[in-house]
Amino acid sequence: MNTVVTLPTEQAPQTLENVGRFDRPLIIILDFGSQYSELIARRIRETQVYSEVLSYRTTSEQLRQLNPKGIILSGGPSSVYGDNAPHCDPEIWNLGIPVLGVCYGMQLMVNQLGGEVAKADRGEYGKASLYIDDPTDLLTNVEDGTTMWMSHGDSVTQMPSGFELLAHTENTPCAAIADHERKLYGVQFHPEVVHSIGGIALIRNFVYHICDCEPTWTTAAFVEEAIREIRTRVGEKRVLLALSGGVDSSTLAFLLYKAIGEQLTCVFIDQGFMRKYEPERLVKLFQEQFHIPVEYVNARDRFLAKVAGVTDPEEKRRRIGHEFINVFEETSKRLGHFDYLAQGTLYPDVIESADTNADPQTGERVAVKIKSHHNVGGLPKDLRFKLVEPLRKLFKDEVRKVGRSIGLPEEIVQRQPFPGPGLAIRILGEVTSERLNILRDADLIVRQEINQRGMYHDFWQAFAVLLPIRSVGVMGDQRTYAYPIVLRIVTSEDGMTADWARVPYDVLEVISTRIVNEVKGVNRVVYDITSKPPGTIEWE
């Protein structure tokens, strides 16, 4: 789980606010609390047009200054007639900028422009067939009867003046509407979700045909602009980066090294909770193959001592996080003066902290929050850097594309998510050297068998968990009393929800047989068939 901590500074930290933005077509998504707002932005970027998510409180004047080619109003959990329902600035309709309202966004548009919205006689949730009344404009190349995803309890009962009906469903008379003259559009369904078969075509129609955008948001353009901006900002100063081996920090290291070379120093803190052979492979890869300087810090004994006797998972995270800060502080001081701290902040982190990071007078970020792969409390007060955050406009899938384009090896680009506290939270209960060794060996077998069959990219995550109990078994003619290992293999698009993977029985059999026979201290292997929700992907 990613968490954030506040970085104390003497002045407002400097960030690369405009990396990846510059002078290109922009689509703004105003967020009304929808779980899909980020997904809308991702879908637009997949069409090679840049998009950003902003609060529904953004004023029409602020939008005018941003000069977007189009505006999308997201869905949300509220009813437009609710006492505390969020409302946008009504002057938005007069900007002359195309607007697309999605679900709640459509209802809000109708409500503010003089139409009527009421509680539906029957809510509509899940898949629905969309019947097209006007196949032009927004619905060009969207097939009649195509599937769209519905999730609403209110419906439009009367369109505002100037609007026409574009489409309906069996239970929703006004499923898509438009005021063609003012370029105002509304859809009651969610075109951004994967279940909406014609959704991508609709989004492309809005972005390209209605908003008249050009495909300028490309990986190559981002890399070129990011490198130029890094060089301009950093100059001849030194930059420090905490390298974890994940795709975010590795891509950041590659990008920075291309921009400023040996002005970059990477610090890799080996806390002893990584998978088998991983620390050695990572350091060798960066130092010998990529020739990027890495300061390796072996702090295994320190971290193990910090979690000795601890069984509560949150306390384990807290102690690991605090010790990481201590080691990082000591290392940075030993290596000399650095002006900048490179931070692998991604766009979802920016969205989550947007309301707390803006100065009410200027709109500038004044209290930057630092993403950490540990559950940490805060950096030391005398550890002061300016920030370099070149990836802060990117989603995870875009980071992978950037990493691949600048030469990051596929084993890192496609690395499955791995928690910051590492194996310490895949060992339930107390972490000991014995348990770490057992879990490392079992986890290695899982990864070997998955990789050998070319199945690694089929899963969001595939790993082993060690339970702090003993089970009875029989090996040879003797009874055993040893640990059980849990296999956790899931499929997912983004980690927010997940399903247990239907791994072939013969693969599970090989994994189980190898673990029981090759890993001393294990006599039982079980398979976790719990989805998320109700369970989580990790066990702690």
UniProtKB/Swiss-Prot annotation:
Top EC class of this enzyme: ligase
Disulfide bonds: none
GO cellular component: cytosol
Pathway the protein contributes to: Purine metabolism; GMP biosynthesis; GMP from XMP (L-Gln route): step 1/1
Residues binding ATP, per UniProt: 244-250
Reactions accelerated catalytically: XMP + L-glutamine + ATP + H2O = GMP + L-glutamate + AMP + diphosphate + 2 H(+)
Protein name: GMP synthase [glutamine-hydrolyzing]
